[in-house]
Amino acid sequence: MSIRVHELAKELNLSSKEVMSRLESIGVDVKNHLSAVEDQDANRLRTRIQKPQGKEQAVEPRKSVPSQESKNLTQGPAEGNRDKSQGLQVESSRVEGEGRPQGQRPMGDRPQGQRPMGDRPQGQRPMGDRPQGQRPMGDRPQGQRPMGDRPQGQRPMGDRPQGQRPMGDRPQGQRPMGDRPQGQRPMGDRPQGQRPMGDRPQGQRPMGDRPQGQRPMGDRPQGQRPMGDRPQGQRPMGDRPQGQRPMGDRPQGQRPMGDRPQGQRPMGDRPQGQRPMGDRPQGQRPMGDRPQGQRPMGDRPQGQRPMGDRPQGQRPMGDRPQGQRPPQRPPATPGTPAVEQPPKRQIGEKKKPQDRNFERKKEMEKEIRAPRGNRRNVKAAPREIRDTAPKHIVIPESLTVQDLAAKMSRKSGEVIKKLMDMGVMATINQEIDSETAVIIAGEMGVTVEVKIEKPITVIEEIEDDPAELRSRPPVVTVMGHVDHGKTSLLDAIRTTKVTASEAGGITQHIGAYQVEINGQKITFLDTPGHEAFTAMRARGAQVTDIAILVVAADDGVMPQTVEAINHAKAADVPIIVAINKIDKEESNPDRVKQELTEYGLVVEEWGGDTIAVPVSAKARMNIEQLLEMVLLVAEIKELKANPNRSATGTVIEAELDKGKGPVATVLVSKGTLNVGDIILAGSSFGRIRAMVDDKGRRVKKAGPSTPVEVQGLNEVPKAGQVFNVVDDEKHARQIAEARANERKAEEVRQTTKVSLEDLFDRIKEGEVKELNVIIKADVQGSIEALKQSLLRLSTSEVRVNPIHGGVGAITETDIMLAAASNAIIIGFNVRPDANTKATAELQGVDMRLYRVIYDAIEDVKAAMTGMLDPDFKEVVQGRAEVRQVFKVPKVGTVGGSYVLNGKITRHSKIRVIRDGIVIHEGELESLRRFKDDAKEVVEGYECGIGVANFNDIKEGDIIEAFIMEEVKRQL
């Protein structure tokens, strides 16, 4: 016969793990709680377990006897010594077996960590919990309690009322007065801090667990007790080793594993939080504090169990069945007097499942325990489900639907539903204004405070001290119509050949140069003259001090010349007119001067205030005179700046260099820009790694009016943006992110608003054909120029839609975007790599590469022309007169006709004209000459003509043949 481990455990009131451990200690190998154990092995285990319990079992049936009787039974030598040393009266009604039957108790009696709810009543037990005489296993005989852990006579309400014990059974750090207030024990019942080896530290405890008169050093004299509080028969580790206690709280008999090591158990073995029934059942629980029958997990693994052996989450009654356990006295907070206990039920009294005052005591316990926070293993009382939604929120001027829902702790769907009820169609990411948000929140019972906080996106301008201002070089912008010689003029000034390097011989982005004339520096900005570069010219005019307007003497004032004049006037910039190409025979400077007067520029020779200098860039004529005029105007303007401050300026141009990363050409307007400075331009920022001047030389600093190329930005800034030097990179990042978020919010606001009018417009737009384009260019300014030029090509029927524009080479990402959106890619001064080309061919994406902006515009124009619906034009081919009418069976009426002019073809459309009125228009059904079908009949011949679906042909009718010709439309 055999018995399973879990059955044996139930029989012995042990955990399966404890039984398995004990079986292994006697040489029986078992794998789990379902393993079978032979009867002889089970008997060996039973015998071994029952040996150390002789004394306890002898007195166990006498639980709850009156105080004097139990004292007589259990008083022993150890108890006597203690009584003598303490001089205290032994407390009654605690028999030895009642406190903690040790034989069959696999689990330690009390964890010592941070047990908030002590097990022992503090009221009548000032000196010691357990007599040590005949109770080798008892918890702690306390001066007046020789008979057990808890006096049962007067303590019906729990094992240890917690009068002045806020922190646990033996809270070891926060218990000022100890488990049992001892008068001279300020440090707690068993402080655990300095006690590595036992429940009661013996070395550093000046006051001891229970000051005993002649026992200054510990709870119990440790002479014969090297390892713990109470050496037990076969307990090698002591009563309660605390630090490295492999044996548990009070290992019993042959319990090598211990009940609960106290090292990592802050909350104690028996959390007292919500156990109204007391720590140990007092009535008929002869087998120990916790019946272990159904506990397949053994002793209670103590590893990472901070909450004690039994989680108290859902167990308001504690780990142990509380059926016949009178309610525990509620714990008290520090300073609260102990709650007086009613008399305990005596032997022979009828058991009640719970004390009749249980409900009242439970409420009292809740009230007393309310302020205590360190109760991790206490199950929280069931709380009412409350509405946690805030009643008051603070919102900005505008916010998204999702943000509003989050602030009100509501679902986004509820907010969207409210908006729909108000007639507002909104998505989760759509912004709504504060007024709408206030209405929505009001309907949901939330009050709203609107707080307008704009993120810092603008850096304050610092006023310069006039005493610190110094003269600076003038910034001169060269403007004019395309091919009028602006760059050639600059070449003549700089004695370089920039024009030769420009694609198509025209300037396609701003060039910034600095030259020195007579010891004075002048900064030149060369702007494009082509109509596509309006934005660039406007930027050039904004940052300049003087504008040189180049006009070809042989060409006169042209559209871009007029535009340049307007830009300069708008920026309030003085204009110097350079009449170029005077070396040509057909040049006529006077005509140019005359044309300029039409736009408000009257030259000095004619009594105006506009300086005009005739020059020849190729022949280098009058170049010095022009520069002298520039210096003269600059001197009159008294251009000054403070070089000793943080730099500010303008981004002239920006590009993405394959090796250097984002590169920006900047013009410093104030202060000095140094390598290592942190600059912020729009939503891009970074620390300057290197600076290069217009001649390609590396420089470490750049003063006012100096153009330099900077490296180190995190992204390509937009041309025309103002840059500032900031002290802190973190601050720069915050401002850049705020600007980027602001821009994104604006884009979302513009694209997500839906109304009936918008819907109608979009339906109409469905009839408009779109040419999607992706623009990639070498510099930011070229993208702008190309985009503006292409948008100007749009008509009411065909529209250019630039879906993406970026600086740098064409990448595979661009190809994928083009394939998804059915777009063509326009590359301006950039080339794709081999992989990108292969991907484009695979995806069937049309990639067009250009170096001259004219070509790009013309090609896009041609593509758009092909998308236009063609026009149809009617072309009359010939006329025939009906001379005779024939009625042919099964065919209908046929008109015998004579071709008057032109020709009649078989596939022509015809119209029948009678007396000058068109009476029918339709298809030609048959065309015959004699009895044969004819393809066409020319002038002067007769033929038979049958008209489809028309038989009312009469003599004298004129049949006119015509076709519709497709005519291509032009933009």
UniProtKB/Swiss-Prot annotation:
The keyword Manganese does not apply. Disulfide bonds: none annotated. Residues 480-487 are annotated as: G1. Belongs to the TRAFAC class translation factor GTPase superfamily. Classic translation factor GTPase family. IF-2 subfamily. InterPro entries: EF-G-like_DII, IF2_II, IF2_N, P-loop_NTPase, Small_GTP-bd, T_Tr_GTP-bd_dom, TF_IF2_bacterial-like, TIF_IF2. Residues 616-618 are annotated as: G5. This is Translation initiation factor IF-2. Residues 471-640 form the tr-type G domain. Residues 580-583 are annotated as: G4. Keywords: Cytoplasm, GTP-binding, Initiation factor, Nucleotide-binding, Protein biosynthesis. Residues 310-326 have a biased composition (Low complexity). Residues 53-63, 342-370 have a biased composition (Basic and acidic residues). GTP binds at residues 480-487, 526-530, 580-583. It comes from Desulfitobacterium hafniense (strain Y51). GO terms for molecular function: GTP binding; GTPase activity; translation initiation factor activity. The keyword Translocase does not apply. One of the essential components for the initiation of protein synthesis. Protects formylmethionyl-tRNA from spontaneous hydrolysis and promotes its binding to the 30S ribosomal subunits. Also involved in the hydrolysis of GTP during the formation of the 70S ribosomal complex. NCBIfam families: IF-2 (TIGR00487), small_GTP (TIGR00231). Residues 505-509 are annotated as: G2. It comes from the Bacteria. Pfam families: EF-G_D2, GTP_EFTU, IF-2, IF2_N. Residues 39-379 are annotated as: Disordered. One of its GO terms (cellular component) is cytosol. Residues 65-75 have a biased composition (Polar residues). It is found in: Cytoplasm. CDD domains: IF2_eIF5B (cd01887), IF2_mtIF2_II (cd03702), mtIF2_IVc (cd03692). Its main location: cytoplasm.
